């Protein structure tokens, strides 16, 4: 994922937020993978999202750390689902629905942003 797309996702979340804010975009998220029978530690840049009000079962100040690898997987899933999304990514014109889908896939269905023009 390129920097422009990464920061565009963070900007769209911050601009159209309803219950989650972007707390940090420069966070290093630790991830471990099994390679050749050995656990390797990798560090990815990640988004830190925080709820600023109670929403469903999530309490205020709940924080999610979503690494760039998972965001990239969500972006790939979006491009598979909607072939026109690839053009929007290249032009830097992602929509709110695109970002909601990316974050939902990147968080394994846990975080549903519910972005809107109006804050509730």
Regions found by a protein language model. Name each.
Residues 17-22:
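Short, solvent-exposed loop/hinge segments that bridge or flank secondary-structure elements
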Residues 6-11:
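A short beta-strand micro-motif
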Residues 23-100, 105:
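Acidic, low-complexity, intrinsically disordered interaction modules
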């Amino acid at each position: 994922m390129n920097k422009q797309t990464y920061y565009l996702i963070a900007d769209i979340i911050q601009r159209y937020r309803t219950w989650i804010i972007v707390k940090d975009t420069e966070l290093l998220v630790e991830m471990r993978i099994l390679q050749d029978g050995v656990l390797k530690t990798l560090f990815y840049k990640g988004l830190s999202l925080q709820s600023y009000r109670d929403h469903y079962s999530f309490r205020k100040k709940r924080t999610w750390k979503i690494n760039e690898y998972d965001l990239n997987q969500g972006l790939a899933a979006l491009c598979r689902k909607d072939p026109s999304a690839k053009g929007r990514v290249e032009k830097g014109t992602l929509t709110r629905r695109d970002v909601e889908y990316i974050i939902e896939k990147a968080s394994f269905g846990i975080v549903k942003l519910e972005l809107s023009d109006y804050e509730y």
